């Protein structure tokens, strides 16, 4: 089994094969990907769809001297297998194993780290120009999906690439007619037999946005209007960018891919190759339902993914989806917005029930936030469902277009904290710090499912921008209450009181997901625990009260310490004039790799045992007692 694949330890081995051996190799590679992912979990549909393209690229181009940048990067398992990591695939996305995305530190063939979408063309162009300036003769290749091509950054790069006439840069559009969620809007119309409608329309919109402000391109603007009316063949659009357009060709036909790439290899200047592929290619279950098989856990390939027979705890994403439907039922002003994450953000049911109030704007986080701001000015109640890591992409819009105008937009921030197998690129570690400094913002962190529901309801009542953050995955098992209860603004609650004598009284100020492990630590130490609820405005009165009645304060959050929720408590403490030693616990100043979330939190000292250990070492050992007594005497 895998007789050919076992002979490939790097692309040089691949290039020694006869052309007639490549299709059998592709069959083995596809089977190996399916077998590997079924054992570890990971991205499947996209990787089954890029097998032939990956083989062709490494066969024709002299990698790693020629650079390949994979947009998003979740489709790179065939690439990893062919570049020396075949025998490490059992560790894919596991702790201390190989990443599910390209990483420069992992292999010289991973020329640029990716995981967020639409960055590849910019990176490849930068590499091409850098190689030019260094006197190196190499190709830089960006492989980008049709969903990622809808983002503005891709068109900004295309516009820039077009003026670099001698740069050896190749953009490959992997047109598989699907991003994670089905593409939307005008981008879904077909203009030609195999030409992706959403890509063409997005290209038109992107060119207009990038170029319309420049007086010299009025003629181009007129040509764009002609494109829209179907008066000019679609390929001309790419030529207006300065690219030589080739395609579309079958992305699963090596006899088409290889000669085409060999011809392109001899050309100079920006090239654009349009290939058509199918997600899930070669595995009928994934072909039939590429969304279900986009990122499965472990499963039996012979049987496919089976529904779980054991009742699962409700996920926070499900809590959000149910809440949004309930609010929309009560109030016709409620609208839901997602940047291409309908399934991931729990909005499938909302779309079915409230289609006229559901807006999937595509991979366009910047637009999503400003779009919501515009809706708010018209009296609507927009709710933006977005992952913490993707909100980073719309930071200017959050400040300039929403907060500065104090518009009542609700941000439902999913995947806050560590996310596990997707690793550092998707960690929601920074949202508290980057939002807390923005005037007019209200920020809440949910400790359980019902609190998440009530916080979301509270957010919808606010006259200003408000964010509720919650983690990936299942909650604590707390049932949600159907009736809504508005939480008093900026007020936390004490969950547990210490019975320790003066000198040993510890108060733990916990935020969101850290309430449960803090309670576990408090049982061991007999400490007070406060569920702070609000990061902004932080409950300054509660901070002062706890400081006045305790000897030591500890803040705990599942986010970066610098500038985070703990910092808000320290600032409130300084304002109160009550001086107490404070220990701030949170995620370390590191990019935390992929792994099991519970194990990663334990390694960060953010489980019950770790929190108790940190408190003991800082405050409750003999040296701390002596220091505390000396401070009190002074």
From Swiss-Prot:
Main enzyme class: transferase
Gene3D superfamilies the record matches: 3.40.50.920, 3.40.50.970
Enzyme Commission number, as recorded: 2.2.1.7
Cofactor(s), names only, from the UniProt record: Mg(2+); thiamine diphosphate
Record-level GO BP terms: 1-deoxy-D-xylulose 5-phosphate biosynthetic process; isopentenyl diphosphate biosynthetic process, methylerythritol 4-phosphate pathway; terpenoid biosynthetic process; thiamine biosynthetic process
Biological or metabolic pathway of the protein: Metabolic intermediate biosynthesis; 1-deoxy-D-xylulose 5-phosphate biosynthesis; 1-deoxy-D-xylulose 5-phosphate from D-glyceraldehyde 3-phosphate and pyruvate: step 1/1
InterPro entries: Dxylulose-5-P_synthase, THDP-binding, Transketo_C/PFOR_II, Transketolase-like_Pyr-bd, Transketolase_BS, Transketolase_C, Transketolase_CS
GO cellular component, one term: cytosol
PANTHER family: 1-D-DEOXYXYLULOSE 5-PHOSPHATE SYNTHASE-RELATED (PTHR43322), 1-DEOXY-D-XYLULOSE-5-PHOSPHATE SYNTHASE, CHLOROPLASTIC (PTHR43322:SF5)
Known partners and oligomeric status: Homodimer.
Name of this chain's protein: 1-deoxy-D-xylulose-5-phosphate synthase
Gene designation: dxs
